[in-house]
């Protein structure tokens, strides 16, 4: 303010010195020196500058036109700048350094937003006389009360099967099978297999190792053989019929070959006399005698037929 007082004193001296400078002194009377504003009332960083408002009686004077432009830039108001938004500056309206000061002052004035965790309503902050103290004893700069940080809303929610579906019922086995990951690719096996029903056939017997020895031949009259067939769970009706048929065929072929061998040996040893044949037939039962006669007749007819065909050919 010492420079301002000297400036006013010099203006007073010029006014009383010469009559030629009365016109200039008349202008200096209207000079108003505005003291610098405080930092609280100056959010845009004009505390380092001095606003000088010049007013002249003559409106057409050049000083008046310059003062209007200077007043427009120096006296920026809040009317065209919202308090929540940063100040909008036009090109050439303010210097770059002053713009940085405006930005820093605006950031300092913005209040720290209060975050609500427990409820959407804004929590009440404690008074400044009782600062918050964290567990370690140091002062806390956060305006959020520590009691709000240990709420039930911050706890992790437990995932239950009822939460996975819209209904409150627990998930059944089919729904749980959908959650099992199934690997893809020909070299990977499926983790989830089809659940076997109670009425399905037990196929474990198909994977048993079979012995190299042939199966023993049982007669149809043997009760143990029929019981073993009935108890086997893997045998189907087709396999049973096929097995029984094979057993019967083997029995017939066995008896046929044994009788055929006996007759062949008899024919080789005999001289062809009917007496020896009759003696052999006497040792046999009547049923076997008729059976052998029918076989001989059959083969004799076959031989005659072949010879007859050859003779005609």
UniProtKB/Swiss-Prot annotation:
Kindly state which keywords UniProt assigns to this record, in alphabetical order: Cell cycle, Cell division, Mitosis, Nucleus
Q: Ranges of Low complexity compositional bias?
A: 135-154
Which residue intervals are annotated with compositional bias (Basic residues) in the record?
184-196
Q: Which GO terms describe its cellular component?
A: nucleus
* Cross-referenced Pfam families: Sororin_C
| Compartments (UniProt record) | Nucleus
Per the record, what is the consequence of mutating residue 305 to A?
Answer: Lost ability to restore the growth defect of the eso1-G799D sor1 double mutant
Q: What happens when the gene is disrupted?
A: During metaphase, cohesion defect between sister centromeres leading to a slight increase of split sister centromeres; this phenotype is attenuated when wpl1 is also disrupted.
What are the start and end residues of every segment in region (C-terminal Sororin domain)? 288-310
Q: Where is the composition biased (Polar residues)?
A: 107-118, 155-170
* Region listing for Disordered, in residue ranges: 105-287
Residue ranges, compositional bias (Basic and acidic residues): 249-264
* UniProt main location, coarse: nucleus
**GO BP terms:** mitotic sister chromatid cohesion; regulation of sister chromatid cohesion
Effect the entry attributes to changing residue 303 to A: Reduced association with the cohesin subunit Psm3. Lost ability to restore the growth defect of the eso1-G799D sor1 double mutant
Q: What positions does the record give for the motif labelled FGF motif?
A: 44-46
The Pro residues compositionally biased stretches are 123-134
Task: Relay the record's extra comment.
Answer: Named sororin after the Latin word 'soror', which means 'sister', because of its critical role in sister chromatid cohesion.
Describe the subunit structure. Answer: Interacts with Pds5 and Psm3.
Task: Report the function annotation for this chain.
Answer: Regulator of sister chromatid cohesion in mitosis stabilizing cohesin complex association with chromatin. Antagonizes the action of wpl1 which stimulates cohesin dissociation from chromatin. Cohesion ensures that chromosome partitioning is accurate in dividing cells and may play an important role in DNA repair.
Give the similarity note. Belongs to the sororin family.
Task: List the protein's name.
Answer: Sororin-like protein 1
Top-level taxonomy: Eukaryota, Fungi, Dikarya, Ascomycota, Taphrinomycotina
């Amino acid at each position: 303010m010492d420079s301002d007082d000297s400036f006013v004193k010099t203006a007073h001296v010029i006014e009383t010195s010469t009559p030629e400078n009365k016109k200039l002194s008349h202008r200096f009377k209207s000079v108003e020196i505005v003291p610098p504003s405080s930092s609280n009332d100056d959010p845009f960083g004009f505390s380092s500058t001095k606003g000088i408002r010049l007013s002249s009686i003559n409106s057409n004077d050049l000083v008046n036109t310059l003062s209007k432009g200077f007043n427009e830039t120096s006296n920026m108001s809040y009317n065209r700048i919202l308090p929540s938004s940063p100040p909008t500056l036009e090109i050439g309206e303010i210097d770059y350094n002053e713009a940085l000061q405006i930005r820093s002052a605006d950031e300092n004035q913005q209040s720290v937003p209060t975050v609500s965790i427990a409820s959407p309503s804004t929590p009440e902050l404690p008074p400044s006389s009782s600062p918050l103290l964290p567990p370690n004893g140091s002062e806390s700069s956060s305006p959020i009360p520590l009691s709000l940080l240990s709420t039930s809303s911050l706890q992790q929610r437990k995932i239950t099967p009822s939460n996975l579906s819209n209904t409150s019922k627990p998930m059944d086995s089919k729904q749980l099978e959908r959650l099992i990951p199934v690997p893809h690719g020909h070299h990977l096996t499926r983790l989830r297999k089809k659940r076997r029903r109670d009425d399905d056939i037990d196929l474990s017997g198909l994977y048993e190792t079979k012995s190299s020895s042939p199966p023993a031949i049982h007669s149809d009259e043997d009760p143990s053989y029929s019981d073993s067939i009935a108890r086997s769970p893997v045998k189907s009706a087709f396999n049973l019929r096929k097995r029984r048929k094979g057993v019967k065929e083997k029995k017939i072929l066995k008896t046929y070959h044994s009788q055929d061998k006996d007759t062949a040996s008899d024919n080789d040893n005999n001289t062809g006399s009917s007496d020896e044949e009759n003696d052999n037939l006497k040792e046999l039962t009547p049923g076997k005698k008729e059976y052998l006669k029918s076989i001989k007749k059959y083969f004799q007819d076959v031989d005659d037929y072949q010879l007859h065909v050859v003779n005609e050919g």
